[in-house]
Structures are given as structure tokens and as C-alpha cells.
Amino acid sequence: MIDPDGFRPNVGIVLMREDGQVFWARRVRRDGWQFPQGGMNTDETPVEAMYRELREETGLLPEHVELLGATPGWLRYRLPSRAVRRNERQVCIGQKQVWFLLQFTGQESHLKLDHTDSPEFDHWRWVDFWYPVEHVVMFKRGVYARALRHLAPLAQTVAGPAAVGVMPQRALEAWLPGSSAAGHDRPRKRPRKRGGVLPVRINND
């Protein structure tokens, strides 16, 4: 489904260990690495979509994670022009996402990238909290920076400030308005919330 502005509702997942390292996976038959993410079905809430995508892309069940929180509202990014299919009845120009922070409480043996017949990833590893902002494909760097910036205070309550650290300068530049990686659209301004996160009750729009 695509909203009237051309954005597809989507969820993103930051899966974090107790030490602040996050799950980082390589897409099948591609060199690109990213966080798990996926589109929402019309009958799903963001939370329901998140658990479905978690199962499909990592093999994990709800009992293998603890849901810590989510970004406030939708964060948007635009697709590069080469990826926009103009001949479709509904043209998708980008994604609007809710990002979830999950603490991994299971065992690594629970991670199964081949859980479905069409796996999204073929390899994974743990990386530092801010690493993905500088290594994801360029057009996603702005939304990654915004998502991790919102979730970092909550991550620090689990892993500690030293383990999570602060956003590196290059990652900060990806988030700042005017950056080529930040995208043309930015989330609408909302009242600041303590800790940068909202409760998990998020309504679809």
C-alpha cells in the first residue's frame, strides 16, 4: 500500500545486544548491508508488522527479544530516481518508517536467515551502534541517522553511555538538513519527548 504522497508504510528494526552492538545483515545476492525492514500490510499495525518482519528476516520470535521503544511517528526517505517505477498505477517515491529498538534476549542459534523460502539476507554480524549510518547505502543514511539518534538514549539505558557512544561527526553530517544523504524530505516537527522515544502504541495513518 502507498499513501497519497507516494510513500509506502514500512517498519525498521534495530536489534541490539546488551553490550550495545547491533545486528547488521547483508542482502542476498547484493553487496549492500542494512537493518531488517519491510512494508506493512493494510490490516497490520506497525508493531504487528515489526514482529512479522522480524520472524521472516531473522527467524526470531517475540520471546527472543524485548521491545524497548520506537521512533516518534513516521521517518521518511526518498528512493533514488532510478528505483522509482513511473509506469506503475501507484508510484512509490519512498518509504515512511517507524523504527523499533529491540533488545536481543535469545541465543545466536535462534537467528535463522533462511527461515523463509526467499531469504532477505545471507550473512550477518554484530557492529557498533553508529556503524550502520556510515555504511548503509547512501540514500538511507539520513533516515538511519535520525532513527538511531532518537533511539540512542533508550539504548544507553540498557548498554550504558560508553557502549553506545555519541553520533560520529560523519554520521551527524548525514542527519543535518542540507546533507546530500539526508534526503529531500524530513519528518514533520513534533513536540520533543523525553529520551527521544515514544511509547510503543503507534497508530497507522
Curated annotation (Swiss-Prot):
PROSITE patterns: NUDIX (PS51462), NUDIX_BOX (PS00893)
Sequence motif: Nudix box, positions: 38-59
Protein name: RNA pyrophosphohydrolase
Entry-linked NCBIfam families: PRK00714.1-4, PRK00714.1-5
Function: Accelerates the degradation of transcripts by removing pyrophosphate from the 5'-end of triphosphorylated RNA, leading to a more labile monophosphorylated state that can stimulate subsequent ribonuclease cleavage.
Record flagged with keyword Hydrolase: yes
Location of region: Disordered: 178-205
Record key words, sorted: Hydrolase
Any single Pfam family the record assigns to this protein: NUDIX
Residue ranges occupied by any Nudix hydrolase domain in the UniProt entry: 6-149
UniProt GO MF annotations: pyrophosphatase activity
InterPro entries in alphabetical order: NUDIX_hydrolase-like_dom_sf, NUDIX_hydrolase_CS, NUDIX_hydrolase_dom, RppH
Family: Belongs to the Nudix hydrolase family. RppH subfamily.
Domain of life from the UniProt record: Bacteria
UniProt enzyme class: hydrolase
Cofactor names: a divalent metal cation
EC number(s) per entry: 3.6.1.-
Compositionally biased residues, Basic residues: 186-195
The organism of origin for this protein: Xanthomonas campestris pv. campestris (strain ATCC 33913 / DSM 3586 / NCPPB 528 / LMG 568 / P 25)
Gene3D superfamilies in the cross-refs: Nucleoside Triphosphate Pyrophosphohydrolase
Keyword Membrane appears in the UniProt entry: no
